[in-house]
Amino acid sequence: MWVLLAVFLLTLAYLFWPKTKHSGAKYPRSLPSLPLVGSLPFLPRRGQQHENFFKLQEKYGPIYSFRLGSKTTVMIGHHQLAREVLLKKGKEFSGRPKVATLDILSDNQKGIAFADHGAHWQLHRKLVLNAFALFKDGNLKLEKIINQEANVLCDFLATQHGQSIDLSEPLSLAVTNIISFICFNFSFKNEDPALKAIQNVNDGILEVLGKEVLLDIFPALKIFPSKAMEKMKGCVETRNELLSEILEKCQENFTSDSITNLLHILMQAKVNADNNNTGPEQDSKLLSNRHMLATIADIFGAGVETTTSVIKWIVAYLLHHPSLKKRIQDSIDQNIGFNRTPTISDRNRLVLLEATIREVLRIRPVAPMLIPHKAIIDSSIGDLTIDKGTDVVVNLWALHHNEKEWQQPDLFMPERFLDPTGTQLISPSLSYLPFGAGPRSCVGEMLARQELFLFMSRLLQRFNLEIPDDGKLPSLEGNPSLVLQIKPFKVKIEVRQAWKEAQAEGSTS
């Protein structure tokens, strides 16, 4: 027994003892590190991680490293370094690390969000982008799909006139249906039990990702039970059952003559690969049902909670700044009126609204720390050496709250995205990357930007969003997870009198 224990301890020491670095190489400054536990005892334990890592820059600078278990992670907190990682050397840093919780979520790095660099990731990312291209024009035009769901949302909110409600469920339904249409040409009904199940699954996954899971740091602990891992497995199993049922129905009715959604794109790619009607990079093995399911799940996971959260953040900030809300509504009244609905082309007319959306994405970035990247070869950042296999994290919070780039960064100031006349949108700083950049940038950026503008312009055109009668304002401190979620709050819904009068006049003319 003692011999086995000694062998076990020696193995751990070998795995977790800091490895020898390249002779003469200059590495990022590192937090202190101990055998086995790495830098864990020296990392701040309280508060929000993205803010803690930002504060560490005061001591260690805009690029520094730390060890967790056997892994070295480099933290990036300046836009020049971030752009080097994401853009200039995007391919060199396009890998994804293996993380226990994310491996379960992604079925061992399938899909696109958490997949490592390689043929599978490249193929599926390309196919997802091809799917979004389907929705540029005609009956499948993205704007039309968003407007349909915005109509349903606004019609529901009209029934809540005078009530104070949590927007989470109706918003989630609307955004889920947009994603579902892109993936399957299928929409859920409000009372559909599958919809509630999907919402519960997303909530459960985000709850686990918001916790520190020791197994992510020390994979050897997988021999011990973990409540967090069991919860993640249960959520993923439920999610896969729901999506598999839809996938199988779509496969039964699939024909190559009508390609109208993401699943059709994936299935057609498999048909082509099976018939050797494609290049060698499109291996049929990379297009199994499990691979398709993982990619579809990524689109649902990344597309629903992110957009829903940002819309709620926008509403919360408008409740805190009622004069700004009034100015945006005045702009809508003057430039759009009540006889038509806003369109994407109105962004250049409703510049204050667009500036407000951009400022919310700055001050409360949906992903305050981007999903970790991994160096797939020996590389460098600036004049510092980065060894192959090193994890690299861009702290978006640090970029968006840098006092040298943003005047009073903790203040909510949409005007910073407008020129001095307040009539033109500007890009005030390169330290602004709300959707990432480069090969690993968010594939749904165009969709998200359209959703945010169209939903908010429609809501403010039709409704006054007011503080509830109890006078309780939303907290602007987020709940950290993979997504920076706002804490639950209620908003009072009031149909605008000007909207009512315009509708009454239209019905009698």
Curated annotation (Swiss-Prot):
GO terms for cellular component: endoplasmic reticulum membrane. It catalyses: a C21-steroid + reduced [NADPH--hemoprotein reductase] + O2 = a 17alpha-hydroxy-C21-steroid + oxidized [NADPH--hemoprotein reductase] + H2O + H(+); progesterone + reduced [NADPH--hemoprotein reductase] + O2 = 17alpha-hydroxyprogesterone + oxidized [NADPH--hemoprotein reductase] + H2O + H(+); pregnenolone + reduced [NADPH--hemoprotein reductase] + O2 = 17alpha-hydroxypregnenolone + oxidized [NADPH--hemoprotein reductase] + H2O + H(+); 17alpha-hydroxyprogesterone + reduced [NADPH--hemoprotein reductase] + O2 = androst-4-ene-3,17-dione + acetate + oxidized [NADPH--hemoprotein reductase] + H2O + 2 H(+). Regulated predominantly by intracellular cAMP levels. The 17,20-lyase activity is stimulated by cytochrome b5, which acts as an allosteric effector increasing the Vmax of the lyase activity. GO terms for biological process: glucocorticoid biosynthetic process; hormone biosynthetic process; progesterone metabolic process; steroid metabolic process. It holds the Pfam family p450. GO terms for molecular function: heme binding; iron ion binding; lyase activity; steroid 17-alpha-monooxygenase activity. Substrate binds at residue 202. Its main location: endoplasmic reticulum. Its cofactor is heme. Its EC number is 1.14.14.19, 1.14.14.32. Heme binds at residue 442. Transmembrane segments: none annotated. Keywords: Endoplasmic reticulum, Heme, Iron, Lipid metabolism, Lyase, Membrane, Metal-binding, Microsome, Monooxygenase, Oxidoreductase, Steroidogenesis. It is found in: Endoplasmic reticulum membrane; Microsome membrane. It is an enzyme of class 1 (oxidoreductase). The keyword Metal-binding applies. Belongs to the cytochrome P450 family. A cytochrome P450 monooxygenase involved in corticoid and androgen biosynthesis. Catalyzes 17-alpha hydroxylation of C21 steroids, which is common for both pathways. A second oxidative step, required only for androgen synthesis, involves an acyl-carbon cleavage. The 17-alpha hydroxy intermediates, as part of adrenal glucocorticoids biosynthesis pathway, are precursors of cortisol. This is Steroid 17-alpha-hydroxylase/17,20 lyase. It comes from Ovis aries.
